[in-house]
């Protein structure tokens, strides 16, 4: 009932709860960031989010293919260790910096994080936004890059410049199209404050 009050159109309750779920032989996931990790795995399977291994990415770069490696980790993680060709584009910032970071629609965009979760989420976000480029996540992220025998750079000091007006306009246009497609409405700051009491 509470979910419906919050505006959810469809909601249901699992009869018997978690105990019956486990008794039926299904698994429950717990641990650090388990909801996010589970959601990313589900999203990748349901949406068929493309992914490439470090070897496949390295091969494409060696063949001269245009590739943009968007490292979507927070700046501190990027600074500590990053793929040499990586570009810092933290999380959702990759959307509103996209046009500045990837000016050619022919460029293959690869999103990577430390392991894979945020890379999957960001790749699917860019796909859903309708960017003109092919997009994939890196399987296993930065750690898998290293385990595959490729170098990392440490103590990176490069920073991504603030987004241009054109990049922000591009992101806004694509976000509005996505919201319209899924019938998502917006609230302003005053309405949000009213909800918060």
At which residue positions do the language-model features occur?
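Cytosolic catalytic domains that perform sulfur/thiol-centered chemistry
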Residues: 1-197
């Amino acid at each position: 009932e509470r979910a419906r009050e919050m505006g959810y159109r469809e909601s249901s309750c699992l009869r018997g709860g978690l105990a019956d779920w486990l008794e039926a032989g299904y698994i429950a996931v717990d641990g650090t960031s388990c909801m996010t990790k589970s959601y990313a795995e589900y999203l990748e399977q349901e949406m068929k989010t493309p992914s490439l291994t470090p070897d496949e990415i390295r091969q494409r770069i060696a063949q001269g293919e245009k590739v943009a490696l968007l490292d979507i980790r927070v700046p501190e993680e990027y600074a500590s260790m990053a793929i040499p060709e990586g570009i810092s584009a933290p999380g959702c910032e990759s959307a509103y910096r996209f046009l500045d970071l990837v000016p050619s629609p022919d460029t293959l965009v690869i999103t990577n994080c430390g392991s894979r979760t945020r890379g999957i989420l960001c790749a699917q976000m860019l796909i859903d936004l309708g960017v003109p480029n092919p997009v994939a996540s890196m399987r296993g992220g930065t750690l898998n890059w290293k385990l595959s025998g490729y170098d990392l750079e440490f103590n990176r000091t490069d920073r991504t410049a603030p987004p241009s007006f054109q990049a922000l306009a591009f992101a806004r246009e694509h976000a509005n199209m996505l919201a319209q497609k899924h019938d998502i409405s917006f609230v302003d700051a005053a309405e949000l404050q009213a909800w918060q009491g």
